[in-house]
């Protein structure tokens, strides 16, 4: 479980780091407006992938901490981590919403049509906020 979660975080961090490097190294490239727009569209796909990996890692980490609530000595530490994960998920869902709203390729898969739509991402934010305000505070 720990290895699985840590590997997902490593993949997400690898995407984030690679995107930062790519952005830094391509700032000074001379591109036409059309080329720059196309390049930025491709960057948004990579950012969406990074978000998805981080979200999967967050969700696995959330489940681990939730399931340990009854057995851990440091209940406040677990509660604090659950809050961090929910806040992270809200931030990720909002960013993914922005990316998907700008690029219909994000969240789309031809045979299933959509894995998720913008409304799903808004609902995720609401669900995370509900858990923060109504569940985490009561555990």
Regions found by a protein language model. Name each.
Residues 1-139:
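Catalytic domains of carbohydrate-active enzymes that cleave complex glycans
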């Amino acid at each position: 479980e720990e290895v699985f979660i840590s590997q997902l975080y490593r993949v997400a961090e690898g995407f984030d780091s690679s995107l930062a490097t790519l952005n830094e190294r391509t700032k000074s490239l001379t591109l036409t407006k059309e080329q720059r727009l196309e390049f930025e569209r491709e960057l948004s796909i990579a950012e969406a992938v990074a978000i998805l990996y981080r979200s999967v890692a967050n969700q696995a980490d959330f489940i681990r901490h939730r399931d340990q609530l009854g057995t851990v000595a440091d209940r406040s530490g677990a509660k604090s981590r659950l809050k961090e994960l929910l806040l992270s998920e809200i931030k990720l869902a909002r960013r993914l919403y922005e990316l998907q709203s700008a690029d219909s390729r994000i969240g789309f898969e031809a045979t299933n049509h959509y894995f998720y739509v913008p409304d799903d991402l808004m609902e995720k934010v609401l669900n995370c906020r509900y858990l923060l305000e109504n569940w985490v505070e009561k555990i």
